[in-house]
Design a protein with these regions (language model features):
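Structural motif
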Residues: 6-8, 37
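Short amphipathic, charge-patterned alpha-helical segments
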Residues: 18-26
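Cytosolic Rossmann-like ligand/nucleotide-binding regulatory domains
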Residues: 32-38
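Short alpha-helix capping/helix-loop boundary micro-motifs
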Residues: 42-47
Length: 67
């Protein structure tokens, strides 16, 4: 397990998780989320290739439509 910060809150997740795993862990739709790791915004095609590490600061911005 590793400790990191997701949206400012400490989280403990499995070692080897990629960004897509983190998004799914928090039950978010990856098609409506923008992910930022340590201040770097990722493109959606990098979610599966980018591993999260101990101490990372992850921001998940979930877009919700409405009217």
């Amino acid at each position: 397990m590793i400790k990191l910060f997701v949206n400012g809150h400490e989280a403990e997740l499995k070692k080897g998780f990629n960004v897509l795993n983190v998004i799914e862990h928090f039950k978010l739709n990856h098609e409506r989320v923008v992910a930022e790791i340590n201040g770097v915004v990722l493109t959606r095609d990098k979610y599966s290739d980018t591993l999260v590490n101990e101490g990372d600061k992850v921001e998940l911005i979930n877009f919700v439509g409405g009217g």
